[in-house]
Amino acid sequence: MAKKAVFKSLYFQVLVAIAIGVSLGHFYPETGAAMKPLGDGFIKLIKMIIAPIIFCTIVVGIAGMEDMKKVGKTGGLAVLYFEVVSTIALVIGLIVVNVWAPGVGMNVDVSTLDTKGIAKYAQPGQMQTTTDFLMNIIPTSVVDAFAKGDMLQVLFFSILFGYAMHSFGERGKPVFELIEKLSHVLFGIVGVIMKVAPIGAFGAMAYTIGKHGVGSLAQLASLMGAFYLTCVIFILGVLGSIAAFHGFSIIKLIKYIKEELFLVLGTSSSESALPRLMAKMENAGAQKSVVGLVVPTGYSFNLDGTSIYLTMAAVFIAQATNTPLDLQHQVTLLVILLLTSKGAAGVTGSGFIVLAATLSAVGTVPVAGLALILGIDRFMSEARALTNFIGNSVATLVVAKWCNALDAKRMNAVLNNETSDEAENPELVLDDAPDVIIPHVPRPIIDHH
């Protein structure tokens, strides 16, 4: 099959759009800032389709399983992985910010900071308890969960629906087939939406540069440098080691998901590429049931980039404002962030909101210090989103392998770019077709009774 021209590839189009957006925002700031609706509109288009895609993927995956015990095993192993890796991310961020000390010497007087920009974030008492977090997973109603697009609530209902349909055996087959066909239609819609991805990336980047300006980067370059370096260390060191231990290369995985990474870079939201990630993980050999559980859950429980950002930003503010933060305070902050970091979704700005809520609840680090990083938070959002996205990609393949739900031969062939005929496997992301993602589930429901 002849490869399509480079300029027709999504990653190339998005990359060019980002470059044009940066140029427009830099040279014509007001015009660039006015492009915000383009980026927002694209994100809304993607979010519009995420909840039904999660529902269909999980229901079809669970209903088609022969052993329902695998669902609980998959979920348990996924949460275990998320907790361990996100804790490592928090600790690495804490270590680097203490060694690099980007805020030391700034000697900022908190009383002189303009806190108008952070007023809407710094509301006291916003931190959720563990009980609140767990209770919020249960939706008030199914309609409300889908209307809000709350991934954990949709995930919860989808698991129940899939389990119930599984128990019906052959009687549930018509519903199974209907939902399977619906999933094909939904992924077809994603393919249509992805046609305007370059426009969304252009609008988001033009707004970012036009609104905040490249000049705002220089003022806090030390913090940004430390954060970006930490993300690279985490991806290549931690995630790279995890990937190598489980039989695949982190570099090859990054190359495999490069189109999605450019999309995430342009929109600063890992959520923007969620549907394509799910399809690509299936294409790489992970079973649909595992992908359906791990990927959506990871968008709340496995935000590695956000975890790094939270510890680094909190300690940076303490350093810049000369706020004493000894080892005991930092350990306390770490423990609290282990809980509050789970409240961040894979959307732009969620990390800043969680940081504000955490500082408001802890009280050790001045909340007013958030004004120091407000101007560069949008630029740090790219690294957060990219790290989150790569982290969830690795998590999906690792958990799939733990659950014996990964076709290692298929994974190696895909990551090594050895799959010459896309017709060999129907669960494919058709990059040479017009960017339409069409997953396929070959097995019907069987009567387990």
UniProtKB/Swiss-Prot annotation:
Membrane topology: Multi-pass membrane protein
Pfam families tied to this protein: SDF
GO biological process, one term: L-aspartate transmembrane transport
Organism of origin: Dechloromonas aromatica (strain RCB)
Upper taxonomic lineage: Bacteria, Pseudomonadati, Pseudomonadota, Betaproteobacteria, Rhodocyclales
SUPFAM superfamilies membership: Proton glutamate symport protein (SSF118215)
Protein localization: Cell inner membrane
InterPro entries: C4_dicarb_transport, Na-dicarboxylate_symporter, Na-dicarboxylate_symporter_CS, Na:dicarbo_symporter_sf
Function: Responsible for the transport of dicarboxylates such as succinate, fumarate, and malate from the periplasm across the membrane.
Protein name per the record: C4-dicarboxylate transport protein
Gene: dctA
Keyword set, alphabetical order: Cell inner membrane, Cell membrane, Membrane, Symport, Transmembrane, Transmembrane helix, Transport
Main location: membrane
Gene Ontology molecular-function annotations: fumarate transmembrane transporter activity; malate:proton symporter activity; succinate transmembrane transporter activity
NCBIfam families recorded: PRK01663.1 (NF002461), PRK13027.1 (NF009587)
Bilayer-crossing regions: 5-25, 45-65, 77-97, 149-169, 185-205, 231-251, 298-318, 332-352, 353-373
Family: Belongs to the dicarboxylate/amino acid:cation symporter (DAACS) (TC 2.A.23) family.
Example of a GO cellular component annotation carried by this entry: plasma membrane
